[in-house]
């Protein structure tokens, strides 16, 4: 027969005392967690959420005495109505870990409090990363410096691209069909500067969006559309230069004004389809947008938070496919340029010059005037070809700068869609503004590498040729200009005589 121990009540009292100590330690830990979370997330949590239900003490003790592996539903949990979902989930997981430790090591109040505080700091830090909290706000000096830099960048972008459009409109030598694509590119960059960069600067400096939820979608759509139009215009420019250099005789028949206008319209329609259609349907981002909190106040954010499907599809259409085409075109242009240089060296060898002089003294009578000079007939370095190669170099530099500016962003854009915590917020903003800065670089490239644009910029800035006095672009066709006729004749002479020997060239010159 079982005989009760005379001090059996002490055996029961000791675990109950340890349990009460553990509850007190949990209460202190919960208070520390509440204070830490309130500080790190800059939100106020009601003091009532840190109160522990005293009636749960018996339940906790009973559960641990009976060997339960977790807290009951009435155990020490913060009020879920006042906490984010991530924090509530982390709290439940943390309770399970604490329960396991209590079962393993016993109820030691000091150890339990230390474990809870350390875990609460870790989970609070992880929660900040998962939820996507905004970083610490910039200081006043940083805001002023960044604001001045962004203002200068926006001004250069707007002014430079307006100059490009005015130069093409007012300068007769720039009113060529190929420059219509440059004008379309300048318009896209002008939209980026005026409609995208201005609102992006205000959003990044304030840390939240103040222009309304509806305009946020419109702004994001313009961002995607203008960037896509810029890339597709560069792809069209590279194709235009390739045809112009590779097959100049057929260029006038293939690339007409109508073809150029239709191509530009198709570029803008495709850019609008990629941007406005999915964004208006709301399939470009997750259902729950991020919320920025400051001193208990919630502010909406407007960021390029894309779904993985839309990020991959839009990036391929807007960037990767056109880039593959442009790189392939410029590789072919480079090979053709190398072959062209070799042909120039082969035609102008010193031995052939002596041979031409010898045939000239034998076959041509002295009293018969020359109609053409041999050195001008077979040379490939006519002004027509020189200007073509300068244009190709200019467009190549434009494409290179464009890739440097936008490749990092599009790589990060796809990565961020699949892994929200892999890319920091500041890194994403810096790479986004690096892409925006490309809109300011193109006019600078024109002024450095293209003398015609440089002279046109000078005339516009000095008001030597007011744009209001310029003739209509549609009334001046490139085929009707004197320069086009002269270059076309020189080009045909070069092509017809490029395969002839020196003796045949002397016979032609003697006619």
Swiss-Prot record:
User: Which ranges make up the Cytoplasmic topological domains here?
Assistant: 170-179, 240-258, 332-391, 451-511
Looking up PROSITE patterns in the UniProt record yields: G_PROTEIN_RECEP_F1_1, G_PROTEIN_RECEP_F1_2
Q: Can you supply one Gene Ontology CC term for this chain's record?
A: presynapse
Q: Which UniProt keywords apply?
A: Cell membrane, Disulfide bond, G-protein coupled receptor, Glycoprotein, Lipoprotein, Membrane, Palmitate, Phosphoprotein, Receptor, Signal, Transducer, Transmembrane, Transmembrane helix
Q: Which residues lie on this side of the membrane: Extracellular?
A: 20-142, 207-216, 280-310, 413-427
**GO term, biological process aspect, one:** cellular response to sucrose stimulus
Q: What else is known?
A: Potency of neurotransmitter agonists in stimulating cAMP production and the lack of stimulation by other transmitters and metabolites suggests this is a D1-like receptor. Low homology to vertebrate D1 receptors suggests this may be a progenitor of the D1 receptor subfamily.
Q: Specify the protein's topology with respect to the membrane.
A: Multi-pass membrane protein
Lipidated positions (S-palmitoyl cysteine) are 468-469
Q: What is this protein called?
A: Dopamine receptor 1
**Gene this chain is encoded by:** Dop1R1
Q: Please list which residues make up the signal peptide.
A: 1-19
Q: Which Gene3D superfamilies match?
A: Rhodopsin 7-helix transmembrane proteins
Mainly resides where? membrane
State the disulfide connectivity. 216-302
Q: Which domain of life is it from?
A: Eukaryota
Looking up CDD domains in the UniProt record yields: 7tmA_Ap5-HTB1-like
